[in-house]
Amino acid sequence: MSKVIETKQQVVTEIADKLRASKSTIVVDYRGLTVSEATELRKQLREAGVEFKVYKNSLTRRAAESAEMAELNEFLTGPNAIAFSNEDVVAPAKVLNDFAKNHEALEIKAGVIEGKLVTLDEVKAIATLPSREGLLSMLLSVLQAPIRNLALATKAVAEQKEEQGA
């Protein structure tokens, strides 16, 4: 086998592994972004723990088929970049959506969230969700509210009894 074919097979395997392992994968069209804008986008994604790479569409199609995500192939036309996140489901959608609001050249095409194909509208809906940490803090505050109210009521009763006893 030639060296070129081996290299391409390694890239296909790498992409397929990333597709399988990532919780969130977003495909974007980056045509029209300047080098400085693309660099800024990469920086923001890196800070959010998201990997952002450009692959040949033909190799990405083969990888999507081998990762059993062939429905992603219809969105692989033109210059594409793919954002992979193994940790946070919301992070790539949030960063890309915020960046796309300020830079019309960036177009979100589709994504795969936990193995399910999602459209542009679904990616935008996910982008409006708070991060995992934000959701956990909201849940914690909801769980603490009844306990806090009970403690305040108990304290008020104790203070009232002290006033009556004094």
UniProtKB/Swiss-Prot annotation:
Any one GO molecular-function label of the UniProt entry: structural constituent of ribosome
Gene Ontology biological process terms from the UniProt entry: translation
Q: Which SUPFAM superfamilies does the record cross-reference, listed alphabetically? A: Ribosomal protein L10-like
Query: Is Nucleus given among the entry's keywords?
Result: no
The UniProt entry, under Pfam families, shows: Ribosomal_L10
CC per GO annotation: large ribosomal subunit
Determine if Nucleus is one of this entry's keywords: no
- Record's superkingdom? Bacteria
Q: Which keywords does UniProt give here?
A: Ribonucleoprotein, Ribosomal protein, RNA-binding, rRNA-binding
List the signal peptide residues.
none
**General function of this protein:** Forms part of the ribosomal stalk, playing a central role in the interaction of the ribosome with GTP-bound translation factors.
Subunit structure as annotated in this protein's UniProt entry: Part of the ribosomal stalk of the 50S ribosomal subunit. The N-terminus interacts with L11 and the large rRNA to form the base of the stalk. The C-terminus forms an elongated spine to which L12 dimers bind in a sequential fashion forming a multimeric L10(L12)X complex.
Family membership, please give it.
Answer: Belongs to the universal ribosomal protein uL10 family.
> What is this protein identified as?
Large ribosomal subunit protein uL10
Q: Which organism is it from?
A: Bacillus cereus (strain G9842)
Q: Which gene encodes it?
A: rplJ
